[in-house]
């Protein structure tokens, strides 16, 4: 529970582990027996890699998805038995650590495979890999027309085990496009079966797919990211069916109060001019802290459950809000910036920035308080 004693500085990030467990249970109930890969890239979306990892591990999650090999090494040093999927290629000089720490890379080209095989030979070891197929994202992944050749090569390699086949759905909000891409992927799976290639795991489901679609029984692994942290992308004109709870909250406090006379301008460039005498509060948080500057002048924070509109430009480390006439505020009063009452959905819609970007920017650099 947040209160003024919880906050030891001008800004406090609270991570609610009860809400994380709630979201995890919703996912488990939706997917049944499928294996979960908890996506922890981007410092667990700004929630803190190590603490989120430890909590999810305590809830019997065994697979984790990362993009940074330094993060992978950190987690492997905590628990060498966990399984980590590396979503993107590691640097050439880190391939030895890929093998040493028994990480599971997503592979999509022969050059990368040859480097991995060479290192496996040196270490006299074998590595599991997941073949990443591109079905429309045009990002990391081999084009589906070229995928059979590389799958066959992996199948026949004495240093590689084709543990998984995977892809990524880029346009979850577009049902027809997504269904077509899934059909392409399923057709490729049938081709593999005809060649007697049977990977243990087949996975294509990100957060949006898990929540909005019926999952094909062949997909026995899922990769939730954003929904773990309390947010989900829905199909157009469709409300989310599940009640996810935000895990991250951001609080600050009022550090200065002053009166502004009618006609006076506020903050840089004077983009706000007072239409009447008003009282303003100074909040020690700004765009350095992940608050997008384009919410200047009209978005709001909450003080004592009342909307306090931002006035003037959001500054690097300060934001100015108007204090309503009927609201009693004093120096030290709590300010809610992201919370269960004011979810990041609102800031995302207003700023036209994604939940991903906002969460990562808000959580960057900061110490967090973990509540359970």
Swiss-Prot record:
GO terms for molecular function: alanine racemase activity; pyridoxal phosphate binding. Pathway: Amino-acid biosynthesis; D-alanine biosynthesis; D-alanine from L-alanine: step 1/1. Keywords: Isomerase, Pyridoxal phosphate. The keyword Isomerase applies. InterPro entries: Ala_racemase, Ala_racemase/Decarboxylase_C, Ala_racemase_C, Ala_racemase_N, Ala_racemase_pyridoxalP-BS, PLP-binding_barrel. It is an enzyme of class 5 (isomerase). Its EC number is 5.1.1.1. One of its GO terms (cellular component) is cytosol. The active site is at residues 41, 268. Substrate binds at residues 139, 316. Catalyzes the interconversion of L-alanine and D-alanine. May also act on other amino acids. PANTHER family: ALANINE RACEMASE, ALANINE RACEMASE, CATABOLIC-RELATED. This is Alanine racemase. It comes from Borreliella burgdorferi (strain ATCC 35210 / DSM 4680 / CIP 102532 / B31) (Borrelia burgdorferi). The lineage of its organism: Bacteria, Pseudomonadati, Spirochaetota, Spirochaetia, Spirochaetales. The gene is alr.
